[in-house]
Amino acid sequence: MTISRRDLFKAGLAAGAALSVPSLLRAQTAVAADKTVRMALENLSVFDPVATTAGISQTHALAIYDTLFSADSQSQPHPQMVGNWGVSDDKKTYTFELRDGLGWHDGTPVTAADCVASIRRWAQVGSGGQILMSRASDISKKDDRTFVISLKEPLGALPSILAFEGPFIMREKDAGLPPTEQVTANIGSGPFKFNHDLAKPGASFTYDRNEKYVPRKEPPDGMAGGKTVYVDRVVWDIGVLADPQTSVAALQTGEIDFLYRPPIDLLPLIESDPNLKLEALNRAGVDMTLRMNCLQAPFNSVKARQALLHLVDQEAVLRAAYGNPQYFKPVTSMFGNTAAVTNDENTGWFKPGGDPEKAKQLFKEAGYAGEKIVILQATDWAEQSNASQVVAAKLREIGVNAELAPSDWGGLVSRRSKRDSVDNGGWSIFITDQSEATRANVFTDISLAMNGEKAWYGWPKNDEYEALRAKWLTLETLDERKALAREMQKLWWDYVPEVPLGQNIVPSAYSKTLTGLIPATLPLMWNMQKA
């Protein structure tokens, strides 16, 4: 569901219809320019973070809502809305008490009933929530500030589930809507208030400082810690993104202050401007990966999958996809380069430039006899298309019959769901990417599953690995997870459900008048200051 401009005006005026037009105009122009930050971000069409996983909707939610727990820069969970909390001796009952000072933008207090309703709504669609509900016997309010989650069996990962992809807490009446019906009130308890009156879908959205928000006292760290707001207003300028050169020109002239994803080919221009700064705020970046159809020849043979692992020259792929080596790195851990559980177990296969002779030998051991290997190529995604061409060329160099199947991304997405042989419309290989930060979450990242038909595209199956993945949910400490991560990675690279192609980190660009921006996987609006 998309909110129309008329709907936004109606929603914004409903709570204060007595305001006159002149008073509204005064309110709209009262914010000083030096206390307003203009950020170039993509269009926001879905306002409900439960209705979509789109990054821009999550960024919106981070501004106006709050969460029970938040993850720091090392992917560790910390209380956010929660003050005191504890778990029973048998690890089956968690009690959470809300901290002081929590209030909705409409002036009413946040209650435990709001939290219970929000958890239940989110759990209907969130993968972590579904795990929680499969183990929960009850989620209930104890009093106005306390709620309890009772479990049928221990779930040591519960704080992490609530921190990584847990619910944005909404008012009980909003959270009472089914997840298929979008919440459009945009009333949260977070550090910013959504300005309905100034909303111009497709052009700009405005967020005003919530002067009544009480931040935590801990310093900000990733999504965790205190969310202190030092500016009066943040405006998302959407229209400026229509043309890459226009967006950079707007940054140079001061029309905007922040550009989240500047065009890679224009980074030298930004770098040469003494008034601008480039910084990789999303330090996890994205990981490009190659998925194989484990159900069909030749990749139903582990030897063929291992052959591809040895063949790939990550640097060649990354250069073709992203160009400047300053913004990419090879990846050898199944968890990427930045997770707290990243490790070097069973990574002896990695060799700069790849190992074509080893790959050729392994294809022979797999019984490969010249069968056609179909690589799905997205013609409307340059990085993916270029990477696909490099992989196809490397396969042909060692005598493999590789064929590119070009289509737009939508066509690729449709075809990758087919489990048939290539002669019946199936596929052998496709390349994609994902936020590296998600790879720290074994229990919510479906690409890290090897449970056959329930797994992500490619449908790998390894029961021994899945037993370890289930064990992850019971662990409570990082040291325990680090040890288990090594066991999992040993099996991962023996089986080879996918092949890593590398990590891409593109910096954000912003005016040097801005300070205090927090490195995170999404752009955060608190803590920044404007000189």
Curated annotation (Swiss-Prot):
Biological process GO terms, please? peptide transport
Query: What are the annotated GO cellular component locations?
Result: ATP-binding cassette (ABC) transporter complex; outer membrane-bounded periplasmic space
Keyword set, alphabetical order = Periplasm, Plasmid, Signal, Transport
Q: What does this protein's UniProt record list under function?
A: Probably part of the binding-protein-dependent transport system y4tOPQRS for a peptide.
Q: Where in the cell is it found?
A: Periplasm
Task: Spell out the Gene3D superfamilies in the cross-references.
Answer: Dipeptide-binding Protein, Domain 1 (3.90.76.10), Dipeptide-binding Protein, Domain 3 (3.10.105.10), Periplasmic binding protein-like II (3.40.190.10)
Q: What is this protein called?
A: Probable peptide ABC transporter periplasmic-binding protein y4tO
The region annotated as signal peptide is 1-32
Q: Name one GO molecular function term.
A: peptide transmembrane transporter activity
Superkingdom:
Bacteria
Give the free-text PTM comment from the record: Predicted to be exported by the Tat system. The position of the signal peptide cleavage has not been experimentally proven.
Q: Which CDD domains match?
A: PBP2_NikA_DppA_OppA_like_16
Disulphide bonds annotated for this chain are none
State the family named in the UniProt similarity comment for this chain: Belongs to the bacterial solute-binding protein 5 family.
Q: InterPro entries of this UniProt entry?
A: Peptide/Ni-bd, SBP_5, SBP_5_CS, SBP_5_dom, TAT_signal
